[in-house]
Every structure is written in structure tokens, then in C-alpha cells.
Regions:
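C-terminal accessory/tail domains of diverse enzymes
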Residues: 1-113, 126-313
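Short, conserved phosphate-binding/catalytic loop or strand-edge motifs used
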Residues: 115-123
């Protein structure tokens, strides 16, 4: 591994993380109790008066609040519509999050597109500029189809909750080349037909794989496209800690690459060998070595083609 890649990996790990996992088949109170038992703090309580969304909260040993909230988009009875919202996390916290996910799975929690459940990942926007955000939008526009195929994203979710980058937004963004965040925000909201209630949580511009509404309201970049695999005979409830870590690593790498590039193109990638295209792209993103082996597996296993040879053996 060369020094440039080592620095790239170091930088991607220094970003902050937030994760939202939608699930059902577990009540919010039970999930909070399970979390506080896992954290060993014994502190959990009903916090809806402060947080809304019928929230139950659990606190870890660092005093951070982990929320379990009601999300009406999740299928099932209201009592078991449960969305885990993490506090601000760091790379070193991923293993803790993974272990909590394993405990939720063992307790019966279910998360996959079939029950209207997705995974949203927030990366702190610190260090980003209008140019780096433009780079990220172009990177996503050129790779969204590849990512969607790799993750087998549910089409209903893509039609409603995690749409691809709006072509009007990309066109205006690359024509106007904003130099301030205010200019960037104007393009984002007007191009997406959502130039109203910019401070409202449910502004319609948010329902994209790459959500910059979160950037202007929460100082994060939200990736809304993820979901756990549907259940199989071997894996019944969809939650998977390794898959979640892979998603987080991909988002961190995308954010870091956008910061490092001078410019990025929105031109779609080659499609004759998707598996090869994904593997080589992950290498450019810095997801190399044993640490990212699971991510490379999850992000290439569903794609057609030969990972080693673009035009076949």
C-alpha cells in the first residue's frame, strides 16, 4: 500500500458517523432496554416529550444518547415500528454498533425492504466545500446505477425514499459551479422543486440516495440508499453487522474522495463488466487490504462479470 492510499484511509477514518436503522418486530422500549443492558449503564427512559416520535432512549457509558423512535414508513403494528438513531460516532465505535445490531437481531428485530425498512448513514460535513460537495454529487451520479445493482436496492424505495440524483440538479450544479454554500443550497432546493420550508425536516428534497438537505440542516451528508438483504432460510431477519460496516466504510470513502479530487465527472461508468467496474472503483476509493475485505465482498457479490478481467478471461 502506497503512502497516498495510507493517508486516504487515515483521513476517511477521521470523519464522524451517524446511523439510522429502521426495523420492526421489536418494541422501542424493549430495544432501548436491550441497548442499556448491552452498555451496562442501566439507564433508559421514555423521552418522547423531548424527542417526539414516541422515542425511548438508552445511554452508553460515555453519556451518549441512543434513540429508538417511531417511523410510520415501517410496516407492521405501531408499537413495533422502531428506528435506531445513533449519537455521533467515530470509526472506533463501529464495532460497538455492530454488536448492538447483533443483539437486536437475536432479540427478533427485522430489517429489510420487504418491511419498509432501510438504513441511512450520515457522514459529518466538516471539511467539505461547495466544490467537494459538487464532486460528491457527480461521483454519485456516475455510480448510482452500479451501486443500486450491487445492493439490489428495492425499486419501490428508489421510486420514493431514495431517488437517484436529479438530472436538473446535476446540470445546474455543473453549469453554475457554486462557490458558496448559500449558492449551492439555492441550486439544491430549486432544482429539486423543493424551494419551500428549507428548515423543515420533511422537505421533499431529502428523498434522494444522496441527501444534501441534511447538509444544510444538520451539517451531515446523508446516504439514504442502504438496506439489509431479504431473509433466507439461513438468515431469517435481514440484520447483518458486516453488511452495515461495509456500508459505513463506503460512505466514509465516498466523502473522503470527494474532498481529495479537484473535479469529478457525472458520466456513467462502463456497464459491460459491472463486477470489474465496482472492484476497481473500490480500490480507487481506498478500500484495499484485509480491513476492507468484507466491504469488497458485499459490494461485488451481486454483480455480473469478472472481478479480475474487464473483458473476460
Amino acid at each position: 500500500m502506497n503512502a497516498k492510499t495510507e493517508k486516504q484511509i487515515e483521513n476517511l477514518k477521521n470523519q464522524t458517523i451517524g446511523v439510522e436503522i429502521e426495523m420492526n418486530h421489536i418494541t422501542r422500549e424493549r430495544a432501548a432496554k436491550l441497548a442499556t443492558d448491552f452498555f451496562g449503564t442501566g439507564r433508559y427512559e421514555f423521552t418522547a416529550s423531548r424527542n417526539g416520535y414516541s422515542t425511548w432512549s438508552a445511554w452508553d457509558a460515555q453519556g451518549r444518547e441512543w434513540k429508538f423512535q417511531k417511523d410510520v414508513s415501517i410496516a407492521g403494528c405501531d408499537a413495533e415500528k422502531c428506528e435506531l438513531v445513533t449519537p455521533i460516532l467515530h470509526y472506533s465505535d463501529i464495532e460497538t454498533l455492530q454488536e448492538l445490531v447483533r443483539k437486536l437481531r437475536k432479540a427478533g428485530a427485522i430489517s429489510h425492504a420487504g418491511v419498509g425498512a432501510g438504513v441511512h448513514i450520515h457522514i459529518g460535513a466538516n471539511g467539505h466545500t461547495p466544490q467537494s460537495l459538487r464532486n460528491l454529487a457527480n461521483i454519485m451520479a456516475s455510480h448510482e446505477r452500479l451501486i443500486a445493482d450491487a445492493l439490489k436496492i428495492d425499486q419501490c424505495r428508489m421510486n420514493r425514499y431514495c431517488r437517484t440524483v436529479n438530472p436538473r440538479f446535476i446540470e445546474q450544479l455543473n453549469q453554475k459551479k457554486p462557490t458558496t454554500m448559500a449558492q449551492f443550497a439555492d441550486i439544491w432546493y430549486t432544482a429539486n422543486g423543493a424551494n419551500y420550508g428549507r428548515n423543515q425536516h420533511y422537505n421533499d428534497s431529502r428523498y434522494h440516495m444522496l441527501n444534501y438537505h441534511a447538509t444544510f440542516t444538520k451539517s451531515t451528508i446523508e446516504f439514504r440508499l442502504f438496506q439489509f438483504d431479504k431473509p433466507t432460510a439461513e438468515k431469517k431477519n435481514g440484520l447483518h453487522a458486516g453488511q452495515l460496516k461495509s456500508y459505513i466504510q463506503l460512505c466514509l470513502a465516498l466523502s473522503e474522495m470527494a474532498k481529495e479530487l479537484k473535479t469529478a465527472s457525472s458520466k456513467p461508468q462502463q456497464t459491460e463488466n459491472p463486477k470489474f467496474a465496482m472492484r476497481t472503483w473500490l480500490i480507487r476509493l481506498g478500500l484495499v487490504g484485509e480491513e476492507f475485505a468484507t466491504a469488497r465482498t458485499f459490494l461485488t457479490k451481486n454483480l455480473d462479470g469478472d472481478a479480475a478481467f474487464r473483458f473476460g478471461r
